[in-house]
Design a protein with these regions (language model features):
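Extracytosolic ligand-binding ectodomains
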Residues: 1-122
Length: 122
């Protein structure tokens, strides 16, 4: 979904997408990192309205991220003071040729245990 949008932007300009898109794991991680940071900054600008955006504003922007899906390449992400991962989701994939094929749904392993450990550490 989001990768198709990127390919369409390149195609519109008569170009091929970057060859790095073929190695989907690393490319997708980069897309995810950029998209999450952009969403945090958008939230910061929306919350502040005007004036200079500070690091604290962006931090609050991260914490305002709720149910962020990025066009289907990840489960709904939610950030909190204790959870900067976005929810602790995982998914198992199998390599078939040049592709990664999901063989499980998105799962959350022992989230209650992880959150309790984080609370004890703070």
């Amino acid at each position: 979904p989001v990768l198709d949008e990127i390919k369409a932007l390149y195609k519109k300009e008569g170009k091929e997408g970057p060859k790095q898109m073929a190695s989907k794991v690393y490319y997708n991680r980069g897309i995810l990192a950029a998209a999450v940071h952009l969403k945090a900054m958008e939230n910061a600008v929306k919350a502040k309205g005007s004036g200079d955006i500070t690091g604290e504003d962006v931090q609050k922007g991260f914490l305002a991220i709720k149910d962020f899906k990025l066009g289907g390449i990840l489960p709904p992400l939610n950030f909190t003071n204790l959870d900067h991962e976005g929810g602790g989701w995982a998914r198992v994939f199998r390599v078939e040729g040049d592709n990664f094929v999901p063989v499980s749904e998105w799962i959350r392993g022992y989230r209650d245990v992880v959150i309790q450990m984080l609370k004890e550490d703070h």
